[in-house]
């Protein structure tokens, strides 16, 4: 039942967080891999556990962990992430990011590469591996 409630909450958040047409595209940190997570996403816990390996594969790029909800469980999960690797956009920015990045995404795990120009340049749907981090970086402008 908890799993269903989590899924319904995620789906409702996506529907309710839509940004009005014509809104400006959100800005992103350059040269970063954004790793979207939530406590109800079992593979996300594994990705966080493997964060040192993902960061090593990212080289000079940053791997930033982005919570998709504000639940206590997700906050507890984020407590295990080094402060320098947490990115918690405010609700309005997160809504704009959902509109900009999450189209066609069935759910988590989900990661997005942001190039040197601050624009999305690659996405991965599924568990992120060090090899996939390297491939995402290779597909982006420095």
Regions found by a protein language model. Name each.
Residues 72-86, 97-106:
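Structural alpha/beta surface segment adjacent to cysteine/selenocysteine redox centers
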Residues 1-3:
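Positively charged n-region of N-terminal signal peptides that target proteins for export
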Residues 91-135:
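Thiol/disulfide oxidoreductase modules built on the thioredoxin-like
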Residues 27-42:
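Short active-site neighborhood of thiol/selenol oxidoreductases, capturing the structured segment around
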Residues 45-57:
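Typically the conserved alpha-helix immediately C-terminal to a functionally engaged Cys/Sec
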Residues 60-74, 82-92:
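Thiol-based oxidoreductase modules, predominantly thioredoxin-like and allied folds used
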Residues 7-18:
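Bacterial N-terminal signal peptides
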């Amino acid at each position: 039942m908890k799993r269903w409630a989590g899924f319904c909450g995620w789906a409702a958040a996506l529907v309710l967080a839509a940004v009005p047409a014509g809104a400006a595209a959100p800005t992103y940190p350059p040269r970063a891999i954004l790793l979207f997570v939530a406590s109800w996403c079992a593979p996300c816990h594994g990705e966080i556990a493997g964060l040192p390996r993902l960061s090593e594969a990212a080289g000079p790029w940053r791997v930033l962990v982005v919570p998709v909800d504000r639940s206590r469980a997700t906050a507890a999960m984020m407590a295990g992430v080094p402060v320098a690797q947490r990115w918690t956009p405010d609700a309005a920015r997160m809504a704009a990011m959902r509109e900009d990045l999450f189209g066609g995404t069935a759910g988590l795990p989900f990661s997005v590469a942001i190039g040197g120009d601050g624009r999305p340049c690659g996405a991965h749907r599924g568990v992120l591996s060090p090899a996939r981090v390297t491939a995402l970086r290779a597909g982006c402008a420095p």
